[in-house]
């Protein structure tokens, strides 16, 4: 997509003293010099004004481009199919430690992610309190949002307290702080709801856009115990993870008929209550995060759209995740079928089963970029083009930044096999997959450029 670069100009006007125009004839040289200076200043001012007008035109064009991107990406969150205007989802699980916004290192900025990517999740968490977010990160997030892209958080979610920030003095991890405030013996029954609220408060205070629940019975979280992994406990048909989902869905996820939250007014009331310490049913210790995070709430936090997604790679599927229920709570499901070439489970697996997890409109087929298996993203993109599934997702999507049209054997083979000539400086697989899923009518004006990074 064409990128329009604009420069903000500082306009200055230099005013001449009137006394220069009342000098005596004896100061003729000074008079002529002053007149020439005045003409030069008027000429330069005119040039500056012309530049300012061009700058304003470019700014308007850039704003229009961002609006176009945002409108397009909103349609990726639909679950209606083509008849309702849905367009393909393009999603990254993005390493939390990679987002460092280093000056001169474009790949560490969200702005370097292709404009076709609808959303990312910060995989593994961020570990940063809202007051510690840098000015560079704030600007990066601002521009990423202007493009219509969303930032969620995501990690395997077997336990409570995971992913929360350290204590204010840095002496306790978020996990340890949670368990100190809400001891197992006293709070086990309320743990799922308390964790959902504390996590929602943290995400909102960062000006992020939601949460992606990675719930894996085949995950690497060790033995299942009530104190250690309460959200994996199967009691009462997986009641604990159900409680977590239902509480989180009050604040994040779809709104309207057929969903847990049926009106925007109800969603706004829930968000307001989330940051009100006196809300009925809240634990007294919840007042601590409320007090600490409220100063960092975005101005639009009550009306902002927050998203709730999930990835359930293996059986059994708790009731909240299955077709018929998943639509009530979640916006999207992402398939961890990394070794499959389409939407089906990986060879040797029977899960994840797309039809049991929301169906094709809710789902995106996953690729494991971290493992180097990039090429399946392109065959999965073809499945999207054929309407068999409605998006792609890349685990550790940021690793594709380094891949060009000429430095990766998988990509070069793809070009040869398909008799194609492409030129990509970064994110070759991601961008080619986007081109397959939903191609533009015309690429004749396309020019390959380095990513544009706007600094504070």
Identify the meaning behind each predicted range:
Residues 1-26:
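Bacterial Sec-dependent N-terminal signal peptides
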Residues 18-456:
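Secreted glycan hydrolases and related glycan-binding modules that recognize and/or cleave
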